[in-house]
């Protein structure tokens, strides 16, 4: 048994030596990115951000290795959700879901506001187009298809196997709450505030808040109060009720803390992290036994991964952080 352990350690050391030499030559290009006056320097691997689609309402950046930042980029409209943004959300997160270099995603907003909710100008235009149809059944079908499109946009966040960290500052209203409810982790700054505003417009929220928000915070009574009244709730209340897990002083601290968390997650095995997310989502909507069966099925193959051996050797030798290949 001792010989086997020594053999594994030798293999591990040789592998790390090879990887160090490989990445020394592979990662020679330094990339500089500036966000809110903070300059991040990191070495690119073989990631090619140019391969991602170009978006009109979102900006994609890579502030650190394996970490992609998706930023809502309609600051002049308070990042309100127009038709283009709804479509681009789905395309973007489906694309990042299969991008091997992406291990963690940070979701943020440009300007003074995270998201002001749905763009009312788009709603008015949709209403005008709808008025051209006279038959109620055909109108209903058009509305149903539009709602489903909106739902799929944020479901893409939840179904993306990469953890999504929402970094919220300023206002987060209506569709913004739908959006971040689909994220894995939520951090916010002191100036953040939230509002499930749909009932104020004479409608029920239909893009995920009613389905996800109630499973995030612990009080069913409070969920109903916030939904039925459309009242604002502060960052402090969001923290108290468990809707966000950290409260930061300002936007700069918010982004720094989000990046630090993302980096910690990104250095873990992507097999383990993505498998954990899949199991958490599945288990949320299934019985305990069904959840156990699901993770057993997943791990019967994933425990045979090189990541398990790499992590085990690192823990046993208490050496450098293990290096995991992309998934």
Label the model's feature ranges.
Residues 152-159, 167, 173-227, 241, ...:
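CoA-thioester-processing core
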Residues 77, 101, 109-153, 202:
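Glycine- (often His-adjacent) and acidic-residue-rich active-site loop
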Residues 1-60, 326-327:
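Eukaryotic N-terminal low-complexity, Ser/Thr- and Lys/Arg-rich leader segments
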């Amino acid at each position: 048994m001792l010989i086997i352990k020594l053999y594994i350690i030798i293999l591990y050391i040789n592998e790390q030596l090879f990887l160090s030499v490989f990445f020394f030559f592979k990662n020679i290009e330094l990339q500089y990115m500036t966000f809110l006056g903070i300059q991040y320097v990191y070495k690119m691997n073989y990631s090619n951000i140019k391969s991602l689609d170009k978006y009109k309402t979102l900006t994609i950046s890579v502030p650190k290795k394996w970490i992609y930042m998706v930023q809502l980029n309609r600051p002049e409209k308070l990042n309100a959700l127009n038709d283009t943004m709804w479509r681009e959300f789905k395309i973007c997160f489906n694309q990042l879901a299969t991008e091997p270099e992406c291990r963690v995603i940070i979701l943020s907003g440009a300007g003074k506001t995270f998201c002001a909710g749905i763009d009312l100008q788009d709603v008015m235009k949709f209403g005008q187009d709808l008025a051209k149809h006279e038959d109620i059944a055909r109108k209903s079908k058009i509305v149903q298809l539009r709602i489903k499109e909106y739902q799929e946009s944020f479901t893409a966040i939840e179904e993306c196997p990469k953890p999504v960290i929402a970094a919220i500052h300023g206002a987060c209203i209506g569709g913004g709450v739908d959006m971040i409810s689909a994220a894995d982790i939520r951090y916010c700054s002191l100036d953040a505030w939230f509002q499930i505003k749909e009932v104020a417009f004479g409608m029920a929220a239909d893009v995920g808040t009613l389905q996800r928000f109630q499973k995030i915070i612990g009080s069913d009574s409070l969920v109903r109060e916030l939904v039925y009244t459309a009242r604002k709730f502060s960052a402090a209340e969001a923290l108290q009720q468990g809707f966000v897990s950290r409260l930061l002083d300002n936007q700069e601290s918010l982004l720094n803390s989000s990046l630090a968390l993302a980096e910690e997650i990104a250095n873990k095995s992507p097999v383990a992290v993505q498998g954990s997310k899949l199991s958490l989502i599945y288990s949320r909507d299934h019985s305990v036994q069904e959840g156990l069966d699901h993770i057993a099925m997943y791990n019967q193959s994933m425990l045979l991964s090189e990541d398990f051996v790499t992590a085990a050797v690192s823990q046993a030798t208490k050496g450098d952080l293990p290096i995991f290949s992309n998934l």
